[in-house]
Amino acid sequence: MLLGIDTGGTYTDAVLYDEAARTVVATAKSPTTHHDLAIGVCGAIDAVMAMGVIEPSAIELVSLSTTLATNALVEGKGRPVAAVIIGFDSDVVERAGLSEALGNDPAIFLHGGHDPHGSAAAPLDLARLADEVRAIDSRVEAFAVTAQFSVRNPEHELAAAEVVRELTGKPVTLSHHLSARLNGPKRAVTAILNSRLISIIDGLVRTTEAALADRGVNAPVMVVRGDGSLVSAAFVRERPIETILSGPAASLVGAAHLTGLDDAIISDIDRKSTRLNSSHQIISYAVFCLKK
């Protein structure tokens, strides 16, 4: 038995699916409670399990999808972050959309980075970084670090991240962890967006895992990515940007599986938008650099 949970901007839905019989056993819906996600998640889980009349031990896998990340970015409700930009002039990164991604949040620009061959272009001033981090620590919840050509040599990103973690204990996104592509300014923007989402998606995952554990469900929790594939909860805690369009992707994959059709047009309608998709092309979206 499979349990699917989708936390959207308005409702949290749950479904029990019997894979062996290819049958939907029960569905349930509960309002998404943004002030405390546990209320909506628990409500949906309790309702669907009551309707399905099953034991918690019968659930073998839990699949979680959500539009919380998408909505947070669209509505500008991501958490406050700081960007650490190494080896780039500010105007270069600005052209990639840094101002739009950061808003009023701070950015630290440092000399450093590497050349295309992986050799250091300039030394990295870690003492200055430490001073800057201390000055802005109270204003942010996470950091995003991007260094020039870090995909060829991540040394400066790793060193900067170590300083930030030691001083703050807060989450740090490294751009070379998100992509192997060379466009550093766009990697910087993607790293910023990822950092904005960390606490949001981490909160959802932790809430869901706790709700399941309280009800005796010991099945692994997997999360739907924006391309429809499943990844571990630990993975999306560090890379929540991978859940962009998670909800619509789950709708598309689910519709294709339930109907068994090779070609179909699927409509995904919610409070904020309507999406039309073709079943032979699973949703593929990334902020530039999620495409390897």
Tell me what each language-model feature is.
Residues L276-K292:
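Single conserved hydrophobic/aromatic residue that forms the stacking wall/gate
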